[in-house]
From Swiss-Prot:
This is Transmembrane O-methyltransferase. It is an enzyme of class 2 (transferase). It comes from Homo sapiens. The chain crosses the membrane at residues 31-51. Catalyzes the O-methylation, and thereby the inactivation, of catecholamine neurotransmitters and catechol hormones. Required for auditory function. Component of the cochlear hair cell's mechanotransduction (MET) machinery. Involved in the assembly of the asymmetric tip-link MET complex. Required for transportation of TMC1 and TMC2 proteins into the mechanically sensitive stereocilia of the hair cells. The function in MET is independent of the enzymatic activity. Belongs to the class I-like SAM-binding methyltransferase superfamily. Cation-dependent O-methyltransferase family. PROSITE patterns: SAM_OMT_I. S-adenosyl-L-methionine binds at residues 137, 139-140, 145, 163, 193. It catalyses: a catechol + S-adenosyl-L-methionine = a guaiacol + S-adenosyl-L-homocysteine + H(+). Its EC number is 2.1.1.6. It comes from the Eukaryota. Disulfide bonds: none annotated.
Amino acid sequence: MGTPWRKRKGIAGPGLPDLSCALVLQPRAQVGTMSPAIALAFLPLVVTLLVRYRHYFRLLVRTVLLRSLRDCLSGLRIEERAFSYVLTHALPGDPGHILTTLDHWSSRCEYLSHMGPVKGQILMRLVEEKAPACVLELGTYCGYSTLLIARALPPGGRLLTVERDPRTAAVAEKLIRLAGFDEHMVELIVGSSEDVIPCLRTQYQLSRADLVLLAHRPRCYLRDLQLLEAHALLPAGATVLADHVLFPGAPRFLQYAKSCGRYRCRLHHTGLPDFPAIKDGIAQLTYAGPG
């Protein structure tokens, strides 16, 4: 194409020619482009970041991009797809086989963001050691950690588990009952932990929690721990376990537990299921009393 042009109005004046038909050339707008040299200068940095954080990129792809695509295509959430797999591959009434089936599905099919077998062994061992009469779990999710706790409870033990999302809670309820645990042993409460904790004593006859598992949103851990303290639900010697304290992390919760003087703290270092290079951990707190 030619250079853009337009007519210029005539210039009147004595001794000047008529320029009414003169053409005025207008330069074409320049499009800003990055110099190839600058782009090449950034290439080593980009490659370094991709290599260093490749595990996080893989996790992002599996937990966000692929999961969202499958949600749209199937019309089901990942927890619902996982339960459908369990129904066709696991043995009803066998919680151990159900847990193994979930692990297999998460590693071979779709990443479930569950506790996984390594953390699961830590959780079961601590429940067996403490032999709590009553356990409170905040964050049921699909019911994986719920089954771990229920398997390790002493005879007559009771587990209350709280899940804020009704649709996720419906899946967890079916999984718990499929494993063979009735409502007298494992009771699932649908609601936010912030609303449920103040009602535990009056509505659910929970006067004390010998062991608490925090497995919901790490940013809510500190708030919920202080709510448990405020409502006197933690007896002296109670154990509080908190998952995901390193990834995505709960720094304010850990700082409070270490500095308030009411807890003895220990950290069990682990990795994420299927992503062992991404470091995480379970915090174990032992409550000394109100002080």
